[in-house]
Amino acid sequence: MGKYQERLDTVDFPYDISYIRWSGHGDNAVPDPELSEFIKGWNETYEWPKFHISSTSEAFAAFEKRHGDEVPVMHGDLSPYWEDGTGSSAQETKMSRVAADRLTQAEALGAMFSPTVSRTAKVHEAWRNILLYSEHTWGAWCSVSDSESDFTKKQWDVKRQFAVDAESLSKALLSKVMPAAGGDAASIDVHNSTSWVRNELVVLSAAMSAAGDHVKTERGASVASQRLATGELAFVAHAVPAFGSARFHLSRGKALAPAKRATFADGVMENGVVRVKIDAATGNLVEMMLHGKSENLVDRSKGEGANEYLFLEDADVTQVQQAGAATVRVEEVGPLVVSVRIESSAPGCNSLVRRVRLVAGEDHVELTNVVDKKRAQLNPHPGKGGPGDDFAQREAKESVQFAFPFAVSDGTMRIDVPLAVMRPEADQLAGANKNWLPVGRWVDVSNAKHGVTWVTLDAPLVEVGGISANMLGSQRDPDKWRKHITPTQRFYSWAMNNHWGTNYRAYQESVVEFRYALRPHGGYDAAEASRFAIGLSQPLVATVASAGAVATPLLRVEPEDVLALMLKTSDDGAGTVIRLFGASGEERKAKVTWTTGAPQMWLSDLSEQRGKRVEGEVLVAGWDLVTLRADRV
């Protein structure tokens, strides 16, 4: 207690209430029966300070009552520390992330096509699995020091099953909400589960596209298509309405080539909108620019390329290793889709395969990195020692990174975080982690004239400015942690690691796919970055056309920088719930217009209960989430 009081005095703690957390001896401890007697004895012996056993809520309620008006208001991101473990099981993290987006789509499409059908129990079960995979209790205390024990394996089996079940449940729900197929297998319906109009590539399986290579819209206009080397059929679905569908027809005619073709020659991939160059020796992207612009948006000053594989053993970043010589092979020659396969040897892997894809007319390039990971070294003395010993804390540590150095003069980096956008350093609170940062869907680097939006679909951690996630084991010395992030346009996707000494996985092995996208652009637009990223993670869904006409779009949200992040049937089955997000960061007056009927709408919250009646527009603050409930008439 003397040391604690000294610490309060050192920092000039100005309040007369403090909160001390006691969780027993170690985390996840059982209640401590000695605590009550200790507090009783202390209060009887000493006049000051007095102790009260309380819950967190009680303690902070007492603090707020006495000092609420004196507490300073702080704004910013308290970037966390524990999330490094998501990279210790990259495949399962990917499964859970994808399942969350798939489930969001299933709920929206269910509200569009069968709003009176209740799926609440199954939806809640799927979300429960997603949340329990994301929850911090990853595995056994000896997961690194004794990784092959039944104790460790059984706990990991339980944890992994949450991701497996989330994946299977979300797939089943998405399949179940889709309209039943009609009798015309040559007609395809393309469904949009988001609140903005979409123009995107759709890929049909060989079986689904057996009717032919030529594609027409419902009005008879031909659209660009291409039979891929895999047997699949790719075509561009134009003007798929928000929360609606568009119908396309296949026939035996010749595929229509786009007006401006996508090409690949001499290492250069271009489509009249975007141009990228792949280095033949390394397979890295060494140039990227918008058509008509001279600025190369890839920073080559340190010899790195974009999407470069980097492998770090232990903590010395000067010893980082690159992939071996690349073999570059064209898989799709265009004219609609160009795809290049880049195969390399890679330290820490059995193989590394990277793919770069560009679609005619699209303003971005897609990257797919397939890592066939080798298993890290196991503890040579399993069962001896524990998470605090040398092996668990410092030995056989490794990580996989992909580099993204951008050349945007005086560019500001912005990171998508839950319901906000964060600038490293500038928007971080004191005490925030600066060695690694979680990312939702995208990072943008831009100045007033141009920039790049980077999207990650599977890997949720980045290192900013350099490889800075090299804190092995339990680093308790605060002076070892990074204190500042200087302005930079360079970052690294921290895809895999085994750095922590307990709970998280000791190793990963076999195949994991990491997907990214790069979109060069003009000035920064936060809402456009979110639309782009959500569009990739919640793609258009194609089905064999249903009987009858295409359903009318359900509703329209205005303005375009207010996004509906959620559309679902209410849990009670009596209405529809919409969650509107102020994606521009600026206050907007939003309007929801229903295409058929005009249901009564109320402000609501997570309870989905009716609040204040909504007439006309609703105010949506920047980065705010506003929930509306609409009851069917």
Predicted feature residues:
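C-terminal (or distal) subdomains of carbohydrate-active enzymes
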Residues: 4, 171-633
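Catalytic grooves of carbohydrate-active enzymes
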Residues: 1-178, 193, 451-543
